[in-house]
Amino acid sequence: MRNRGHLVLPVLIVMICVVSGCAITPTPKVQQPMSVRPPDLPVIPPSQTSGGIYQAVFDYQGRGRYIPLFEDRRARSIGDTIIVALNEKTNASKKTGSNAQRAGEIGLSVPSFLGLPFKSIFQDLDLEATSSNKFDGKGESSSNNNFTGTIAVTVLDILPNGNLLVSGEKQIGINQGHEFIRLSGVINPINIINNTVSSIQVADARIEYRGNGYLDEVQTMGWLSRFFLSISPF
């Protein structure tokens, strides 16, 4: 008995350590890269100089870049950045109900069963059975989400029709944790005004807002708890 008592404490410590490590942070929904390196541009020959109408534009490495004269500065190439104004507001509600009821009854008098003379044997024995089933179920759910802010995204690719595949991330450190805002989607260049576009105009948008501090870990259910919850019949 004493040997078993000495084993209880180590076993409890191991179980506590295992259960404490059961919480797993969910994987991000935005899986593609958050940024990309712009492609190398050809160097403009020294003989190509600015004139009265045409203006040759150079970057910090001396590489030439074409900018139309009568168009505003907006993202149009891989590696360019766009400001996305987050303005998401969704409301959803659902209410369901069902009702089912069934009843049955059966009676049997043995002396008259099939017209056979069983009266003297069973002494007027009667059989009777009844059954009744009733089911009533109701369900109701509602959701209300509101998300506002801004985030800068990077053009990852240009689709054949000219649309821009973008993705970006913003990290904010608050006290002992960090908040992550991730966004990816497809933007039509026509909707870009002053290099800004609304999130409601982003196609195939994936917006994710999460944290990695202790508050996020507390709100995450461990895999062992989810396992017992999935097999529980109650």
UniProtKB/Swiss-Prot annotation:
Topology in membrane: Lipid-anchor
InterPro entries: Flag_Lring
Lipidation (N-palmitoyl cysteine): 17
UniProt keyword Lipoprotein present: yes
Keyword Magnesium: no
GO cellular component term of the entry, any: cell outer membrane
Signal peptide: 1-16
A molecular-function term among this protein's GO annotations: cytoskeletal motor activity
Keywords, sorted A to Z: Bacterial flagellum, Cell outer membrane, Lipoprotein, Membrane, Palmitate, Signal
Domain of life: Bacteria
Residues carrying lipid (S-diacylglycerol cysteine): 17
Localization terms from the record: Cell outer membrane; Bacterial flagellum basal body
Function: Assembles around the rod to form the L-ring and probably protects the motor/basal body from shearing forces during rotation.
Assigned protein family: Belongs to the FlgH family.
NCBIfam families linked: PRK12699.1
Subunit and interaction comment: The basal body constitutes a major portion of the flagellar organelle and consists of four rings (L,P,S, and M) mounted on a central rod.
Protein name: Flagellar L-ring protein
Organism listed in the record: Nitrosomonas europaea (strain ATCC 19718 / CIP 103999 / KCTC 2705 / NBRC 14298)
